[in-house]
Amino acid sequence: METRGTTGEETISYWFDLPIDVAEFEEKLGIGAESGDYRIIEKVLPYADEVHEHTSVYQLNELDFMYRQLSSDMQEEYVSLLTVFENLEALYICRNVIIVYPDCKIMIDVARQKLMNDPTFKHLSDDCQEYYFDFEAYASHLQEHGKFLVTEHGIFELPE
């Protein structure tokens, strides 16, 4: 961040880690956090596209809070998830209804995991499930009737 000095004033720059402590910000730059007399000149953030030169300290802290509330799987696949969600806030709002299948690479893996976690099928033996359950058909059904995002590190089941 740097101050926006008027003619003849010295420009002060300082690097802050998030979340930004407002008191430290005001002390280091010598201006109020609400003044708007500063601008962001550099940033290294996963959600950098949502931060602009005039983003306020409070907005930065809010974005940082939302990002930190995402699961580690969602943080790891943040860029992929943004192909489905409009922005960080939209992802943050839906974070608790997104189901992550971190060990799944294909939809058949998801079908198997769903079956293993479904109490309806708990009483069936593994042999019975393996021989009589059509995982390919169930995977196709899931894909046709659900919304999934397949990533390098797992599969995300998204809200409709």
Language model feature labels by segment:
Residues 1-36:
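N-terminal ordered "arm"
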Residues 2-8, 45, 152-154, 158-160:
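Short, flexible beta-strand-to-coil junctions
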Residues 7, 72-76, 148:
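Intrinsically disordered or highly flexible coil/loop and linker segments, enriched in small
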Residues 22-89:
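Structured domain cores in non-transmembrane regions
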Residues 27, 31, 65-68, 80, ...:
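Charged/polar, solvent-exposed surface patches and flexible loops
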Residues 78-79, 83-120, 137, 159:
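Extracytoplasmic/secretory-pathway segments with low complexity and glycosylation-like composition
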Residues 112-160:
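Acidic, proline/glycine-rich low-complexity IDRs
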